[in-house]
Amino acid sequence: EFRRVLFRSAAPVLTAILYLMIFGHVLEDHVKVYQTISYTAFLIPGLVMMSLLQNSFANTSSSLIQSKITGNLIFVLLAPLSHMEFFAAYVLAAILRGLVVGLGVFLATCWFTTITFQFPIWILAFALISAAVLGALGLIAGIWADKFDQLAAFQNFFIMPATMLSGVFYSIHTLPSVWQTVSHFNPFFYMIDGFRFGFFGVSDVSPWFSLSVVLGFFLLVGGVALRMLATGYKLRY
């Protein structure tokens, strides 16, 4: 079991290193996003947050769907836990996994360039809240899905595109005006932009606005997840 957890945590770290080596090597001398900040340095916070988001989502969604399919979810439901406690347990576990993977990605990639920490409190705030958002989204997906194919569709058609189009590899100011407008409707963009602000002190939008959007999105998805748990949607009926 320990080796399985280690493998699941190591895989996203290796993926992030590959992204950094390929994009950083190819575009380092051709892309300048912020003054005095190299493209490789710009990439690292985005890759850290991308890994954190994807693994926070995977932790709750895969745990829940696996329990539903194998039939052992009944033992969780029989425990004297309220829907609030159920929600907190799954989301806190997602936060922990997301932070562990994110830290692993950072430690593996920070050797490629010099990274600064302008505002560590912003880094921590966006990491925690964003992991909670994806943990709650994972709960929604895990409750809704009846099989792994449905969960994969949710991840492939929503989580992955929203993450990849959130400014991990670019600043939205480099996009045409139409796509800049579209990007502002993507809550994942505010997670990554605010997280990156904590490292460099510069961002595409105000970190306070990003924080308000991310908090609002958490209240939305958290409310939906709690409602699904309270009514027993696809869990008790």
Predicted segments with their positions:
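Hydrophobic transmembrane alpha-helices and immediately adjacent juxtamembrane helices
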Residues: 1-237
